[in-house]
Amino acid sequence: MAEMSFLSSEVLGGDFVSPFDQLGLGAEESLGLLDDNLEVAKHFKHHGFSCDKAKAGSSEWLAVDWLVSDNSKEDAFSGTDWMVEKMDLKEFDFDILFSKDDLETMPDELLATLDDTCDLFQPLVQETNKEPPQIVNPIGHLPEGLPTIDQGAPFTFFQPLPPSPGTLSSTPDHSFSLELCSEVVIPEGDSKPDSTTTGFPQCIKEEDAPSDNDSGICMSPDSSLGSPQDSPSTSRGSPNKSLLSPGALSGSSRPKPYDPPGEKMVAAKVKGEKLDKKLKKMEQNKTAATRYRQKKRAEQEALTGECKELEKKNEALKEKADSLAKEIQYLKDQIEEVRKAREKKRVL
């Protein structure tokens, strides 16, 4: 039981400590990159100083805070201003960094090497400040909604190294030259179609990485194709992207065009003819209805006139019938009186 509890405590301790160990290893690796590549420590060592003092001095005046700063959030070029500046070593207080004995023995060659390290990257900055080769952007200005390049991921930290032709020739291969995509506007005749088709997929591929939308910076096709790391990615992405021509992209997004004027005129004429037919039919129906009403009224008036005449005739005939009935009754009475009179005469 004691052994099981001891093993479980070790496992739990390892679980709790492991994430902090990983963070510590990442921090040590990031600091180790700076300390290993700084060649200033070697100059200190040649002139009789210890490695600890050289590292202390280099870490004091080359602090990690101003190398790894938040300039990437503001602008892509704001972090490279320190490469152009010349550092005046008189402003630094070397009494704090080194003892007086060390300062007295410090030769002038050390100061010269420090000045050289400050001016090391000046030719590289001049090359980046030159106008990049102008290439036609086949899709025009990219929309702001698309993500641009992550400013922290593709850049490599410039490290002060001793000026040598080997290092100066090798650094442009690993560093990227930048260009503003929104400012590249030249006529189509000046650029070759091959360069545009191969450069366009790389620009789109680099923009897939999430970053700030304010900078609007994409990688230049010449620099991306020149580096050995990005050449296979461009060769893979170019066939798929080159198939999409600018006309196809614009045609898919645009709505269908309006009908030509000839079809409009024909449609208007057909509609006008239909309306005219309907209006004519309506007028004919109205006239037929009015005529029918007029006929009915005339017929009714005629019938009413005849009815009145017949009623008058009927009344006249009734009067005649009454008069005739009275005459018949009078005649019957007369006949009865005559018959009675004859019977009396016979009796007598």
Curated annotation (Swiss-Prot):
N6-acetyllysine carried by residues: K308
Ranges of residues in domain bZIP: 275-338
Pfam families referenced in this protein's UniProt entry, alphabetically: bZIP_1
Residue numbers bearing the 4-hydroxyproline modification: P232
GO cellular component: ATF1-ATF4 transcription factor complex; ATF4-CREB1 transcription factor complex; centrosome; cytoplasm; nuclear speck; nucleus; plasma membrane
Cross-link (Glycyl lysine isopeptide (Lys-Gly) (interchain with G-Cter in SUMO2)): K53, K256, K264, K269
Motif position, BetaTrCP degron motif: 211-220
Changes after translation: Ubiquitinated by SCF(BTRC) in response to mTORC1 signal, followed by proteasomal degradation and leading to down-regulate expression of SIRT4. Interaction with EP300/p300 inhibits ubiquitination by SCF(BTRC).
Keyword Acetylation among UniProt keywords: yes
Biased composition (Polar residues): 221-241
Residues covered by region (Basic motif): 277-297
Region (Interaction with GABBR1): 302-338
Keywords attached to this entry: Acetylation, Activator, Biological rhythms, Cell membrane, Cytoplasm, Cytoskeleton, DNA-binding, Hydroxylation, Isopeptide bond, Membrane, Nucleus, Phosphoprotein, Repressor, Transcription, Transcription regulation, Ubl conjugation
Region: Disordered, residue numbers: 151-174, 187-265
Function as written in the Swiss-Prot or TrEMBL entry: Transcription factor that binds the cAMP response element (CRE) (consensus: 5'-GTGACGT[AC][AG]-3') and displays two biological functions, as regulator of metabolic and redox processes under normal cellular conditions, and as master transcription factor during integrated stress response (ISR). Binds to asymmetric CRE's as a heterodimer and to palindromic CRE's as a homodimer. Core effector of the ISR, which is required for adaptation to various stress such as endoplasmic reticulum (ER) stress, amino acid starvation, mitochondrial stress or oxidative stress.
PANTHER family, sorted: ACTIVATING TRANSCRIPTION FACTOR ATF 4/5 (PTHR13044), CYCLIC AMP-DEPENDENT TRANSCRIPTION FACTOR ATF-4 (PTHR13044:SF2)
Subunit structure: Binds DNA as a homodimer and as a heterodimer. Heterodimer; heterodimerizes with CEBPB. Heterodimer; heterodimerizes with DDIT3/CHOP. Interacts with CEP290 (via an N-terminal region). Interacts with NEK6, DAPK2 (isoform 2) and ZIPK/DAPK3. Interacts (via its leucine zipper domain) with GABBR1 and GABBR2 (via their C-termini). Forms a heterodimer with TXLNG in osteoblasts. Interacts (via its DNA binding domain) with FOXO1 (C-terminal half); the interaction occurs in osteoblasts and regulates glucose homeostasis through suppression of beta-cell proliferation and a decrease in insulin production.
Protein name: Cyclic AMP-dependent transcription factor ATF-4
Species: Bos taurus (Bovine)
Protein's gene: ATF4
